[in-house]
């Protein structure tokens, strides 16, 4: 196996000596999109399986409709596949999107929660899943699956084959999947998936093995956009979507996302001794991900829910009534009129397009190398150490996907406020007034590069009464921007390579467990971690320039939890108290500011948040066929200081406002602070399983805008009612959701062979409760007249009662 070792060492060396240019994509206005298609609707709970923490499974598969994330901290999960963390510090590369619908290719080796010790790696997040694609872990045979759903997909097909040879022969695991949702059959519009995966593994002499995995998923799907409550009322639809419209008599969905990134990984493992193992992993992902949407410049806003077009904008009650009646009788007016848009483009004297369908492209090269060494000293002491090198390079540009009956589109920056300078609008001053044709690139053209080297070591001791572990990690992150266009706004700072930005990070954690008896024990986990910023935080707006974001400090997190556990034969009880603090949080937003009559950058820095609460759960087995799971959780997630902020004009980065934000004691999370969950799983017969889960969620804050809560604005308000209407944060009403699933297996006889068939049915929101999945304040605010209702809240609602049906045939 000398050639395998040589290959790994060569690629490790290559990754290390490469020049390290860091990247990160532009931070644009957040697009609030709830993507129902990402949920696993055909999941059926595993009956009578004791999890370390039932909160994770209940919240993940049943509580997402409330944005229920245990302990309140979003985006705090990670997934390690074959020893590789594919997550990137750069925007534009969504690793999980690259295997959408392909979860069957993975086998879970381990999962740790609350930063507990793992022999598979070092976790810095609330929950880390360690997955493998090794063909050795799948049973030999064929699996054929078909499914139907009115939420995630209309139809799905999967074929899975695993071939297991002799010990020293190659083993194969292969997987094919397709999903299809025709236009208009889901709130997001459409969905198309074609994916394939192949995994090869071979055992060699001297306890060595090598494996190769390739997955390739081509997915495109629509995205649902939020809207104000008024349009939901006018449309009489709980899943109203303003981002689609009619084109030549057909439904047209321009708001979408796609992925086309093949991912290759190679793994090598060797047992050096009976007590030590080394694992080496290499990975490479090369391809393209992106989004598309309707764009426009120098013309009227085409969005049907634009505030000036709605009845509420009129001050005349008679006019409002007439508009309400008109929308009631003309529901097509609540969708985009693409036929009208085409006429406007055609009517242009020069045949210039004012409206286009734009595609935001991220051209991705992502390389990974990692090593893990595990050592068992004796029956009491063990340790593991590892390193991962991550190198990402992403090229960002726009492509005109559809000119909508026009002949060209000017390569202008439509977000610029006219300052009288002739070159301000130019995206590329070397090609001024460039006419872009369909399929050609336009707009920002830049590259971001990043490199991270992460290392860690962990030690664990087990004794009859005590267990403890401790771990230390250190990482270095590097970022750089490279601009390929010289735009008219930032002539001296848009073209060429930026300064190389370097950020170290370090952290430690510890775990102590005391066993009162074989059934009862107490555990405490504590940690302190310094995180490096990602590229979106480092650069203010890399699409235009390489200026660094203000308030750039390392993110600091520390915390502790204390838990009590009882593990009986028929009952399992958990009670946990936790406290976590986060410092130097930052936020950045691009929006239009009425007071300055300009697009601006809003930057928040040195924000501090506290997450604290109690978690409890009970599992018990009744009558030998019924498992009952209950959970009650209460938390308090709040901002603990008044952070700093700045407002910078987009045209020239001139600071027009700065100071403090009055955010102290306001909510730090949008998930519910109070949750109660009950799950009943029954097995009336050996082949039949039934599950019913109900979740009650309360004290759930909306997502709110920080910048209108500045001391600069609020301290001038003498009227308490006006002050409260702007400063205070609204909470959503407490609600309840009921979900259910049913599975049945039967055996067909074919000669002497039995062929098992598995059927499963899952139902979400059985009571069809109208649940707002997402509610947020718009970034646009009336800073002049301080009218909080001028730009009302935007909503996305749950789809209501949804189902998924799956049938699987297995031949061994």
Where are these regions (language model features)?
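C-terminal beta-signal and adjacent terminal beta-strands/loops
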Residues: 628, 696-714, 744-812
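Acidic/polar loop-and-plug regions of large Gram-negative outer-membrane beta-barrel proteins
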Residues: 209-267, 292-358, 423-436, 590
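Transmembrane beta-barrel wall of Gram-negative outer-membrane proteins
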Residues: 150-181, 185-224, 262-273
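Surface-exposed extracellular loop regions of Gram-negative outer-membrane beta-barrel proteins
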Residues: 227, 425-435, 478-489, 508, ...
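Outer-membrane beta-barrel signature, preferentially recognizing the C-terminal barrel domain
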Residues: 239-263, 267, 446-448, 496-511, ...
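Periplasmic plug
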Residues: 48, 68-114, 130
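A beta-strand signature from Gram-negative outer-membrane beta-barrel systems
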Residues: 96-145, 156-158
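Gram-negative outer-membrane beta-barrel transporters
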Residues: 379, 465, 572, 577-583, ...
């Amino acid at each position: 196996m000398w050639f395998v070792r040589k290959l790994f060492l060569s690629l490790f060396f290559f990754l290390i000596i490469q020049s390290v240019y860091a990247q990160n994509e532009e931070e644009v206005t957040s697009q609030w999109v709830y993507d129902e298609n990402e949920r696993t609707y055909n999941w059926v709970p595993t009956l009578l399986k004791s999890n370390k923490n039932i909160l994770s499974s209940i919240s993940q598969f049943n509580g997402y409709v409330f944005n229920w994330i245990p302990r309140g901290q979003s985006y705090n999960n990670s997934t390690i596949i074959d020893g590789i963390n594919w997550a990137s510090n750069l925007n534009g590369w969504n690793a999980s999107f690259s295997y959408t619908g392909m979860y069957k290719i993975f086998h879970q080796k381990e999962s740790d929660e609350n930063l507990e010790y793992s022999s598979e790696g070092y976790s810095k997040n609330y929950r880390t899943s360690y997955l493998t694609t090794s063909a050795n872990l799948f049973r030999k045979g064929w699996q054929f699956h078909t499914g139907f759903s009115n939420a995630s997909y209309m139809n799905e097909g999967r074929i899975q084959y695993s071939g297991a040879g002799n010990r020293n022969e190659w083993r194969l695991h292969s997987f094919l999947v397709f999903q299809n949702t025709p236009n208009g059959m889901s709130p997001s519009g459409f969905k198309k998936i074609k994916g394939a995966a192949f995994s090869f593994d071979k055992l060699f002499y001297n306890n060595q093995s090598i494996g190769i995995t390739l997955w390739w998923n081509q997915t495109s799907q629509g995205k649902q956009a939020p809207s104000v409550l008024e349009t939901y009322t006018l449309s009489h639809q709980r899943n109203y979507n303003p981002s689609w419209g009619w084109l030549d008599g057909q439904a047209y969905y321009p708001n979408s996302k796609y992925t086309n990134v093949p991912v290759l990984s190679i793994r090598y493992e060797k047992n050096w001794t009976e007590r030590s193992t080394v694992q080496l992993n290499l990975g490479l992902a090369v391809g393209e991900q992106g989004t598309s949407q309707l764009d426009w410049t120098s013309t009227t806003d085409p969005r049907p829910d634009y505030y000036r077009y709605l009845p509420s904008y009129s001050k005349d009650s008679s006019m409002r009534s007439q508009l309400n009646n008109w929308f009631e009788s003309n529901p097509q007016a609540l969708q985009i009129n693409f036929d009208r848009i085409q006429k406007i483009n055609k009517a242009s004297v020069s045949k210039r397009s004012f409206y286009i369908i734009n595609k935001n492209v991220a051209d991705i090269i992502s390389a990974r190398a990692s090593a893990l060494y595990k050592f068992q000293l004796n029956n009491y002491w063990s340790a593991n150490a590892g390193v991962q090198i991550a190198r990402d390079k992403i090229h960002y540009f726009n492509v005109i996907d559809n000119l909508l009956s026009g002949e060209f589109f000017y390569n202008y920056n439509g977000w610029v406020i006219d300052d009288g300078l002739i070159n301000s609008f130019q995206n590329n001053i070397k090609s001024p007034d460039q006419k872009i044709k369909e399929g050609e690139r336009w707009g920002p053209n830049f590259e971001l590069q990043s490199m991270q080297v992460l290392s860690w070591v962990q030690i664990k001791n087990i004794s009859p009464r005590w267990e403890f572990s401790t771990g230390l990690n250190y990482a270095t992150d590097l970022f750089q921007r490279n601009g390929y266009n010289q735009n008219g706004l930032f002539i001296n700072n848009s073209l060429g390579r930026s300064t190389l930005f370097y950020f170290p990070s370090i952290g430690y954690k510890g775990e102590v467990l005391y066993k009162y008896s074989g059934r009862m024990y107490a555990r405490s986990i504590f940690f302190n971690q310094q995180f490096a910023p990602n590229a979106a935080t480092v650069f203010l707006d890399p699409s235009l320039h390489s200026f660094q974001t203000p308030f750039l400090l390392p993110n600091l997190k520390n915390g502790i939890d204390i838990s009590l556990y009882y593990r009986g034969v028929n009952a399992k009880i958990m009670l946990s108290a936790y406290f976590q603090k986060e410092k130097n949080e930052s936020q950045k937003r691009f929006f239009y500011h009425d007071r300055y009559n300009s697009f601006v950058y809003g930057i928040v820095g040195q924000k501090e948040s506290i997450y604290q609460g109690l978690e409890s759960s009970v599992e018990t087995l009744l009558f030998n066929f019924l498992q009952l799971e209950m959970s009650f959780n209460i938390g308090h997630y709040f901002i603990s200081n008044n952070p700093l902020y700045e407002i910078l004009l987009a045209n020239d980065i001139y600071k027009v406002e700065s100071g403090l934000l009055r955010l102290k004691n306001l909510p730090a999370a949008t998930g519910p602070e109070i949750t109660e969950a009950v799950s009943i799983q029954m097995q009336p017969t050996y082949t039949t399983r039934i599950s019913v889960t109900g979740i009650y969620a309360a004290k759930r804050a909306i997502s709110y805008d920080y910048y209108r809560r500045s001391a600069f604005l609020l301290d001038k308000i003498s009227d308490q009612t006006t002050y409260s209407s702007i400063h205070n944060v609204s909470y959503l009403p407490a609600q309840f959701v009921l979900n259910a699933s049913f599975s049945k297996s039967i055996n067909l006889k074919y000669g002497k062979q039995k062929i098992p068939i598995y059927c499963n049915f899952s139902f979400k929101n059985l009571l069809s409760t109208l649940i707002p999945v997402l509610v947020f304040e718009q970034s646009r605010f009336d800073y002049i007249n301080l009218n909080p209702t001028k730009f009302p809240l935007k909503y996305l609602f749950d789809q209501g009662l949804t189902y998924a049906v799956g049938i699987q045939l297995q031949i061994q």
